[in-house]
Amino acid sequence: MGDAEKGKKIFVQKCSQCHTVEKGGKHKTGPNLHGLFGRKTGQAEGFSYTDANKNKGIVWDEGTLLEYLENPKKYIPGTKMIFAGIKKKGERQDLIAYLKQSTSS
């Protein structure tokens, strides 16, 4: 899929202001992402989601994240995630490779 090392740099630049990935990491503006893969939208315990996120009902995996990260507001209209998205597919694949590695250990 992607390159996790490159993905880590993308995460630090574009995601870490609002998200953490480590087990037991705190929620920031966005939820902690540990355990993301295989979880339904809007399910990180202790984070206040919009109804749009809670009701989307998809399960996060490589495919859903690839689509979501391109344009979050288009994928989940009503999400409070203000990030515009990552247009380059390769960058999204690198980020997903990093997330897969960092959110499951």
Curated annotation (Swiss-Prot):
It comes from the Eukaryota. PROSITE patterns: CYTC (PS51007). Keywords: Acetylation, Electron transport, Heme, Iron, Metal-binding, Mitochondrion, Respiratory chain, Transport. The modification N-acetylglycine is found at residue 2. One of its GO terms (molecular function) is metal ion binding. GO terms for cellular component: mitochondrial intermembrane space. InterPro entries: Cyt_c-like_dom (IPR009056), Cyt_c-like_dom_sf (IPR036909), Cyt_c_1A/1B (IPR002327). It is found in: Mitochondrion intermembrane space. The keyword Thylakoid does not apply. PANTHER family: CYTOCHROME C. Belongs to the cytochrome c family. Electron carrier protein. The oxidized form of the cytochrome c heme group can accept an electron from the heme group of the cytochrome c1 subunit of cytochrome reductase. Cytochrome c then transfers this electron to the cytochrome oxidase complex, the final protein carrier in the mitochondrial electron-transport chain. This is Cytochrome c, testis-specific. It comes from Xenopus tropicalis. The gene is cyct.
